[in-house]
């Protein structure tokens, strides 16, 4: 199977991020600001310090290729409670695990710092996996990638094989037992107000999936 969720003409992808989401809750203590010395704990300032403890150069705007990142995408708070939401992304499984561990390590740092003053954990970090790199499931069935590549070449389309800096439904399907690489659909500027797709690119995508169907009917496959 294939998903049609790629960008420019020729894109063919069978690697994607390992992904997790984190929700971090910061607890504070509110008192009159005029008499707050040594008493007030401002949860918003602790959240800010937490963000500053994340690697500065490992954000979406500072990374590319196979580089992973932390992405803070939501922050809402008051003195007594602040909730921060971020996503964690990495292609490498070991580095992915290290990133998740770092979230808990930073949380524990602040819990230790405020233990005497607050009396309980001041930072509560919840990290949940979202999806995984499909490469592990697709490579043993690499012929499905080769088939799509052959289809493109027969249509004079230059295959652009590269990692997806995101995820697709194909990642979930791959881990459900249906290896599912991704083929271009022509979209550009995803997740922004300038997102668009040329009709000509969609037409090329249709030609590719028709050619894949034709080749499937006439090709003998050896999964091994």
Kindly give the residue locations of the regions a language model identified.
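Metal-dependent amide/peptide-bond hydrolase catalytic core
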Residues: 44-224
């Amino acid at each position: 199977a294939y998903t049609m969720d790629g960008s420019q003409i020729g894109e063919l992808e069978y690697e994607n991020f390992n992904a997790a989401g984190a929700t971090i809750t910061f607890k504070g203590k509110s008192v009159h600001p005029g008499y707050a010395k040594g008493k007030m704990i401002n949860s918003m300032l602790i959240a800010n310090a937490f963000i500053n403890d994340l690697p500065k150069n490992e954000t979406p705007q500072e990374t590319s290729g196979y580089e992973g990142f932390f992405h803070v995408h939501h922050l809402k708070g008051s003195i007594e409670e602040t909730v921060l939401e971020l996503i964690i992304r990495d292609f490498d499984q070991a580095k992915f695990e290290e990133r998740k561990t770092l979230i808990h390590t930073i949380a524990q740092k602040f819990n230790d710092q405020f233990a005497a003053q607050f009396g309980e954990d001041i930072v509560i970090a919840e990290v949940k996996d979202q999806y995984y790199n499909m490469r592990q499931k697709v490579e043993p069935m690499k012929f499905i990638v080769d088939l799509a590549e052959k289809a493109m070449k027969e249509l004079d389309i230059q295959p652009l094989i590269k990692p997806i800096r995101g995820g697709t439904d194909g990642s979930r399907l791959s881990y459900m037992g249906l290896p599912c690489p991704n083929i271009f659909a022509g979209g550009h500027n995803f997740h922004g107000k300038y997102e668009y797709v040329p009709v000509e690119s969609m037409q090329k995508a249709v030609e590719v999936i028709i050619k894949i169907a034709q080749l499937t009917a006439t090709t003998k496959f050896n999964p091994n």
